[in-house]
């Protein structure tokens, strides 16, 4: 040989090579059936390991076309510089690519495959029978697949799907469902992460112990705030209930006094008018009677006087009785109306207090981001009310609540509140 040329072959490969009639030669015309190792880039030096041509049907030659490339196995092909193809039908088409295993394919620069039927694209690594990966991906395990860039799939039949770039699937049949994710199962196969240390940074995972501690702390704070809010609400309700009751009583007393004054004034006015009318009528009749008596004084003085006196007595008595009767009827009617108004007012007060009690029984949501629906009943004396409401806790400090109460007929009471804590 005109130039130094070094070949390093593993013990297994040397044993395989020399178990058959292989030889070294400087002959450009030699054909190769199972093994071919290319010379270096100097065209004057062609050092090869070969076996005399024995063609199978369709051809079984190994082909190392790239500089410093190696092809071992029937129909193995190393097409680019420093490529290695080992195994029947293996193909290494990229620079520095390695395909080991029957029908394995390293189809890009620096791609590496190991396993029967495995496939790797540029800068990818596929280890395991039928494992496959796209550019810059890593697939380890039988039938593991990486169809997205810069992703990793480890485990039997694990899979990183198309467009799920920068994702990782770990475990038997694990599958990803989005970008930038780590999957240890799939929709119907869930796994647990065990022996997980407590997280210390914002981007660390939280274990169950940490979660329980935070839940207990949150519940404690919620109970404390709930007690404070309940106390404030009860105080407010008590003050408003007392104020409402006092206002109702005052209004009832005012209405009663007004009605009584009106009745008295009207009764006095009617009585006075009736009396004046009676007196006027009596005086008129008396004058008429007296005139008639004077005309007939000579012939019927005694009879006329008797008749006049009788008529006057009857007329005055009837007019007076009628005036008193009308006055009594009017007064009774007004007092009856007053009683009805007082009864209605009393009923409205009872319904208002029952509605207030029902609204106060509604709950406020305690969970952050939770919406609640609540219902309650209330009663006061013989009146009852039903209340419904809803609330929403925006965060730990802010909450909203609204409710409406119905006490029958058209008696409806409602409220709404906004709560902020610090």
UniProtKB/Swiss-Prot annotation:
GO BP term, pick one: protein transport
Domain notes per entry: The signal peptide, cleaved at the inner membrane, guides the autotransporter protein to the periplasmic space. Then, insertion of the C-terminal translocator domain in the outer membrane forms a hydrophilic pore for the translocation of the passenger domain to the bacterial cell surface. The crystallized section of the passenger domain is an entwined trimer, and forms a bent coiled coil 8 nm long and 2.2 nm in diameter. It includes a transition from a right-handed to left-handed coiled coil which occurs over 14 residues.
UniProt-recorded name of the protein: Adhesin YadA
Species name: Yersinia enterocolitica
Quaternary state and interactors: Homotrimer.
Cross-referenced InterPro entries: Adhesin_Head_dom, Coiled_stalk_dom, OM_adhesion_Yersinia, Pilin-like, Serralysin-like_metalloprot_C, YadA_C
Localization (cell): Cell surface; Cell outer membrane
Molecular function terms from GO: collagen binding
Functional summary from the UniProt entry: Collagen-binding outer membrane protein forming a fibrillar matrix on the bacterial cell surface. Promotes initial attachment and invasion of eukaryotic cells. Also protects the bacteria by being responsible for agglutination, serum resistance, complement inactivation and phagocytosis resistance.
Gene null: resulting phenotype: Decreased binding to host cells and to host collagen I under dynamic flow conditions.
Stretch forming the signal peptide: 1-25
Presence of the UniProt keyword Signal in the record: yes
Keywords: Cell adhesion, Cell outer membrane, Coiled coil, Membrane, Plasmid, Protein transport, Signal, Transmembrane, Transmembrane beta strand, Transport, Virulence
UniProt region (Translocator domain), positions on chain: 370-422
Family in the record: Belongs to the autotransporter-2 (AT-2) (TC 1.B.40) family.
Pfam assignment, any one: YadA_stalk
Example of a GO cellular component annotation carried by this entry: cell surface
Domain of life: Bacteria
Gene responsible for this protein: yadA
Residue ranges of the region described as Surface exposed passenger domain: 26-330
Transmembrane regions listed in the UniProt entry: 369-379, 383-394, 401-407, 411-422
Region (Outer membrane translocation of the passenger domain): 331-369
Stretches assigned to coiled coil: 216-362
């Amino acid at each position: 040989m005109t130039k130094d040329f070094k070949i390093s072959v593993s013990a297994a490969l040397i044993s395989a090579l020399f178990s058959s009639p292989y030889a070294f030669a400087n002959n450009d015309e030699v054909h190769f059936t199972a093994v071919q190792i290319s010379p270096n880039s100097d065209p004057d030096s062609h050092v090869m390991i070969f076996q005399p041509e024995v063609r199978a049907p369709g051809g079984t030659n190994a082909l190392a076309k790239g500089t410093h490339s190696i092809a071992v196995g029937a129909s193995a092909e190393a097409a680019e510089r420093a490529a290695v193809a080992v195994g029947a039908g293996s193909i290494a088409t990229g620079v520095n690519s390695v395909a080991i295993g029957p029908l394995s394919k390293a189809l890009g620069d620096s791609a590496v495959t190991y396993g029967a039927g495995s496939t790797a694209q540029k800068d990818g690594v596929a280890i395991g029978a039928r494992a496959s990966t796209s550019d810059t991906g890593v697939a380890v395990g039988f039938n593991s697949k990486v169809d997205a860039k810069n992703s990793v799939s480890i485990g039997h039949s694990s899979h990183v799907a198309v467009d799920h770039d920068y994702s990782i699937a770990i475990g038997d049949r694990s599958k990803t469902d989005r970008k930038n994710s780590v999957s240890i199962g799939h929709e119907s196969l869930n796994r647990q992460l065990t022996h997980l240390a407590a997280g210390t940074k914002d981007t660390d995972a939280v274990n169950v112990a940490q979660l329980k501690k935070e839940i207990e702390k949150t519940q404690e704070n919620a109970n404390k705030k709930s007690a404070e809010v309940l106390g404030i609400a009860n105080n407010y309700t008590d003050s408003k209930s007392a104020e409402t009751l006092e206002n109702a009583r005052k209004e009832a007393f005012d209405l009663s006094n007004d009605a009584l004054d009106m009745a008295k004034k009207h009764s006095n006015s009617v009585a006075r008018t009736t009396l004046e009318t009676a007196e006027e009528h009596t005086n008129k009749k008396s004058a008429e009677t007296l005139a008639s008596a004077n005309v007939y004084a000579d012939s019927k003085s005694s009879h006329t006087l008797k008749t006049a006196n009788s008529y006057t007595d009857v007329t005055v008595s009837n007019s007076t009785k009628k005036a008193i009767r009308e006055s009594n009827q009017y007064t009774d009617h007004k007092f009856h109306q007053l009683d009805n108004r007082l009864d209605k007012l009393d009923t409205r007060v009872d319904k208002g207090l029952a509605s207030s009690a029902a609204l106060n029984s509604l709950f406020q949501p305690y969970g952050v981001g939770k919406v609640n629906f609540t219902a309650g009943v209330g009663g006061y004396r013989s009146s009852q009310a039903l209340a419904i409401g809803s609330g929403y806790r925006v965060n730990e400090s802010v909450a909203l609540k609204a409710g409406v109460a119905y006490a029958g007929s058209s008696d409806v009471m409602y409220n709404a509140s906004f709560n902020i804590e610090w």
